[in-house]
């Protein structure tokens, strides 16, 4: 039985995508790489594809955090500060659960992220819900990136 982890989405099956791994024994984060080379003009915001989807258990979430070296070395920041990948994003009908990294170039020069370059760290975590949450009506996920809000 699969508990939690990463899989390559169909579109990238033959693209040489690496399954994320932890760099050291005590690392919390799994290094997630760019699936394609992406160029950023000064000030530009773009989505970098990972070629990956993540599966996990109920009551768990995958947080995607910016690598600490990105602002200093690349001039890039994860624009939403933390990416939140919910359990029901996996295999959604819109994009198969393909995870993207939304980055912004805050420099005055073009910045390039190469295919295979580590961009964010994924950390699996349990989460809690508020009292009465089980009594609130929930919608079923029907879309992909950014589909649960405006």
Swiss-Prot record:
It catalyses: dUTP + H2O = dUMP + diphosphate + H(+). The keyword Cell membrane does not apply. Disulfide bonds: none annotated. Coiled coil: none annotated. Its EC number is 3.6.1.23. One of its GO terms (molecular function) is dUTP diphosphatase activity. It holds the Pfam family dUTPase. The keyword DNA damage does not apply. Belongs to the dUTPase family. This is Deoxyuridine 5'-triphosphate nucleotidohydrolase.
């Amino acid at each position: 039985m699969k508990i939690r982890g990463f899989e390559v989405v169909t579109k990238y099956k033959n693209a040489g995508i690496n399954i994320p791994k932890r760099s050291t024994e005590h690392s919390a984060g799994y290094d997630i790489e760019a699936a394609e080379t992406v160029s950023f003009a000064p000030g530009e915001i773009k989505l970098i594809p990972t070629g990956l989807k993540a599966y996990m258990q109920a009551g768990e979430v995958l947080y995607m955090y910016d690598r600490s070296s990105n602002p200093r070395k690349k001039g890039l920041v994860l624009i939403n500060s933390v990416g939140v990948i919910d359990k029901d994003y996996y295999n959604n009908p819109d994009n198969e659960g393909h995870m993207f990294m939304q980055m912004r170039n805050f420099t005055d020069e073009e910045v390039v992220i190469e295919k295979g370059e580590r961009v964010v760290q994924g950390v699996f975590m349990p989460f809690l819900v508020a009292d009465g949450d089980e009594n609130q009506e929930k919608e079923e996920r029907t879309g992909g990136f950014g589909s649960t809000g405006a």
